[in-house]
């Protein structure tokens, strides 16, 4: 799958993930993708490989929420990196809602996402879990 730009790749990744098009978003990722979720997030830490990221981290993390949305607002091309700013919104299993800004940094190599790093105010998300 070849995209015009790294920004286009990341935009399509968010769309495919939102629409649960697993085959599409998995194809956009390197087999050995490194996914670094903020330490204060539920199940935060570093995960390596598609299986660990998408079959362990995401199901475990999302199991804390009735709704969890990552809403990208701005995409910035930085050569082999793309920075995305936006907001998370959702409702925890404790019926507490939250909205918090995020920054995501993606590293792209050979038209595949090889690394992800998350920056957000994890305290607001943690408060919704209490």
Give, region by region, the residue ranges found by the protein language model:
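Short, low-complexity N-terminal intrinsically disordered segments enriched in polar/charged residues
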Residues: 1-31, 127-130
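Residue-level preference for beta-strand/loop junctions
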Residues: 5, 66, 80, 98-100
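Short, solvent-exposed coil/turn segments at beta-strand boundaries
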Residues: 28, 32, 78-80, 106-113
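Short hydrophobic/aromatic-rich beta-strand segments that constitute the beta-sheet cores
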Residues: 35, 84, 115-116
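Hydrophobic/aromatic beta-strand elements that line small-molecule binding cavities or substrate pockets
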Residues: 70-75, 87-89, 101-107, 117
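Short, cysteine-centered beta-strand-loop-beta hairpins and adjacent loop/turn segments enriched
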Residues: 90-98
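Short beta-strand edge/turn micro-motifs at domain boundaries
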Residues: 104-127
């Amino acid at each position: 799958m070849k995209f015009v730009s790294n920004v286009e790749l990341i935009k399509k990744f968010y769309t495919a993930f939102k629409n649960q098009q697993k085959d599409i978003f998995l194809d956009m990722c390197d087999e050995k993708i490194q996914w670094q979720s903020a330490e204060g997030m539920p199940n935060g830490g570093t995960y390596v490989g598609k299986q660990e990221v998408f079959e362990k981290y995401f199901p475990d993390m999302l199991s804390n929420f009735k709704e969890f949305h990552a809403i990208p607002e701005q995409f910035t091309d930085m050569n082999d990196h793309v920075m995305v700013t936006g907001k998370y919104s959702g409702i925890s299993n404790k019926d507490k809602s939250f909205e918090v800004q995020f920054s995501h940094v993606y590293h792209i190599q050979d038209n595949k996402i090889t690394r992800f790093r998350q920056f957000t105010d994890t305290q607001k998300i943690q408060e919704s879990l209490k």
